[in-house]
Amino acid sequence: MAEVESFQLDHTKVLAPYVRLIGSETGPKGDVITNFDVRFVQPNANAIGMAALHTVEHSMASLIRDRIDGMIDFSPFGCQTGFHMIMWGEHSSEEIAKVIKSSLEELSSDEFGWDNVPGVAEKECGNYRNHSLFGAKEWSKKILAEGISTDPYERKVI
């Protein structure tokens, strides 16, 4: 079987929350994509509940695109501790961490309500009943309070 980078990561050594550059790849026509590990929760210590994670996913899909061009995808890890963020072009962990921090600040604000969360209707979402804005806001506040590091092994909070 092929080796998968994320399964080679020693999950006992990382210090979440952080943004980690997994790598960049160049396609056959020269296009570059960059993949990031956006880890919100310490692996094997906690997990974001599905309803909150789902609402974070939907909210961040829009909030990130408001702040930076070229986001291809922001997909949750099955372990519910964070997200893969895939971007067109080359980007640094510092640049992405600033975007993530700003997005979480807006999500956690009192002004951010259900009308700001995209894709929560039955025709827009395959599991539209499984959302929690309250949970998404609480997790966002917790992540921001802990600080987002640009290094997975040493706390370098932005």
From Swiss-Prot:
The keyword Metal-binding belongs to this UniProt entry's keyword annotation: yes
Note on cofactor: Binds 1 Fe cation per subunit.
Give the keywords, sorted.
Answer: Autoinducer synthesis, Iron, Lyase, Metal-binding, Quorum sensing
Q: Does the keyword Lyase apply?
A: yes
Enzymatic reactions: S-(5-deoxy-D-ribos-5-yl)-L-homocysteine = (S)-4,5-dihydroxypentane-2,3-dione + L-homocysteine
Where would one find the signal peptide in this protein?
none
Q: Which InterPro entries match?
A: LuxS_sf, Metalloenz_LuxS/M16, S-ribosylhomocysteinase
Q: What does this protein do?
A: Involved in the synthesis of autoinducer 2 (AI-2) which is secreted by bacteria and is used to communicate both the cell density and the metabolic potential of the environment. The regulation of gene expression in response to changes in cell density is called quorum sensing. Catalyzes the transformation of S-ribosylhomocysteine (RHC) to homocysteine (HC) and 4,5-dihydroxy-2,3-pentadione (DPD).
Quaternary state and interactors: Homodimer.
Name of the protein: S-ribosylhomocysteine lyase
User: What species does this protein belong to?
Assistant: Lactococcus lactis subsp. cremoris (strain SK11)
